[in-house]
Amino acid sequence: MADSENQGPAEPSQAAAAAEAAAEEVMAEGGAQGGDCDSAAGDPDSAAGQMAEEPQTPAENAPKPKNDFIESLPNSVKCRVLALKKLQKRCDKIEAKFDKEFQALEKKYNDIYKPLLAKIQELTGEMEGCAWTLEGEEEEEEEYEDDEEEGEDEEEEEAAAEAAAGAKHDDAHAEMPDDAKK
């Protein structure tokens, strides 16, 4: 069986046989733990006994809605679904273990990198100033300063014009009584 796991199935019939063998293996483990898939699917007490053995997340403890579709499937398909769920749980456990080990490895190497990063920071430090500037930069700075002065004059004129227009508008409304405005 180890050879067939390492090599991909060459034909669809081999793939079906491999899937069936995996399902039988999972079902055999389920049978050793308290019954086969038919009794586990039909007997809620044996399923509860299996659940009590394994710690579960809050999402798994939540009541699950009945799925009429799965209940309408033949027993052989239900067994395959159950086998796939068990295999997925195994994969999830392996993935969780991988994530924990990966985080530990990252932390280990971050600790190793800290002195090197500190030396890099010490060597690079702040940017050093230059004694020379480009000719194009001086011209751009002068143009920018001229534009700023012109913009400020225009803004002051616009603000004065708006204030005068606002005062005229307020005076027109002040002469009318409140009843006439409606």
Curated annotation (Swiss-Prot):
CC terms in the record's Gene Ontology section: nucleus
Subcellular location: Nucleus
Main subcellular localisation: nucleus
Biological process annotations from GO: nucleosome assembly
Biased composition (Low complexity): 7-21, 28-49
Coiled-coil region list: 81-107
Biased composition (Acidic residues): 135-160
Bias kind Basic and acidic residues: ranges: 167-182
Region named Disordered: 1-71, 134-182
Alphabetic keyword roster: Coiled coil, Nucleus
Superkingdom of source: Eukaryota
Protein name per UniProt: Nucleosome assembly protein 1-like 5
Organism: Homo sapiens (Human)
Gene: NAP1L5
